[in-house]
């Protein structure tokens, strides 16, 4: 298709400008808000991509240690009361849990992309677990 030169066109028709009744009060409010600068906002998705790159580079644990430790103790309490854990054992459990979750989210994202979506949904996670053989 051939390119065509675009020329400026004058706007024909439309509504005639109206006289404002409260022009003085409008001018006052405009001058006070003109000094205020709008906060800077990134486009949707920019911050998400930056966070993805940041977390892919890093190796630190993403779940806080104490809440995870409380969760482990709460679950262990159901099986046997008065259990004690070495700190290295809790750390090993946390490493394994985070590795599993990251892997599951990667597979879930692939399922969403396969469905021509960019948003993951519960059905993507169910499909990923079903393919892995974790859930029938």
UniProtKB/Swiss-Prot annotation:
Q: Briefly state the protein's biological role.
A: Core component of nucleosome. Nucleosomes wrap and compact DNA into chromatin, limiting DNA accessibility to the cellular machineries which require DNA as a template. Histones thereby play a central role in transcription regulation, DNA repair, DNA replication and chromosomal stability. DNA accessibility is regulated via a complex set of post-translational modifications of histones, also called histone code, and nucleosome remodeling.
Summary of subunit composition and partner proteins: The nucleosome is a histone octamer containing two molecules each of H2A, H2B, H3 and H4 assembled in one H3-H4 heterotetramer and two H2A-H2B heterodimers. The octamer wraps approximately 147 bp of DNA.
Q: Where is this region: Disordered?
A: 1-43
- Give the protein family: Belongs to the histone H3 family.
Q: Does the keyword DNA-binding apply?
A: yes
Protein name in the entry:
Histone H3
Q: Which residues carry this modification: N6-methylated lysine?
A: 10, 28, 37
The alphabetical list of record keywords is: Acetylation, Chromosome, DNA-binding, Methylation, Nucleosome core, Nucleus
Q: Which GO terms describe its cellular component?
A: nucleosome; nucleus
Gene Ontology molecular functions? DNA binding; protein heterodimerization activity; structural constituent of chromatin
Provide ranges: composition bias, Basic residues: 16-27
Q: Does the keyword Iron-sulfur apply?
A: no
Record-linked CDD domains: HFD_H3 (cd22911)
Tell me one Pfam family matched here: Histone
Give residue numbers for the modification (N6-acetyllysine). 15, 24
- Where does the protein end up? Nucleus; Chromosome
């Amino acid at each position: 298709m051939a390119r065509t030169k675009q020329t400026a066109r004058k706007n024909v028709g439309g509504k005639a400008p109206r006289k404002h009744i409260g022009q003085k009060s409008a001018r006052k409010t405009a001058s006070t808000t003109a000094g205020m600068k709008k906060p800077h906002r990134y486009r949707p998705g920019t911050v998400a991509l930056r966070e993805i790159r940041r977390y892919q580079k890093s190796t630190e644990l993403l779940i806080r240690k104490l809440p995870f430790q409380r969760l482990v103790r709460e679950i262990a309490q159901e099986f046997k009361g008065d259990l004690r854990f070495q700190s290295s054992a809790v750390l090993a459990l946390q490493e394994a849990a985070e590795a599993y979750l990251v892997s599951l989210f990667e597979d879930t994202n692939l399922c969403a992309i396969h469905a021509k979506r960019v948003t993951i949904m519960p059905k993507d996670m169910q499909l990923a677990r079903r393919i892995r053989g974790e859930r029938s």
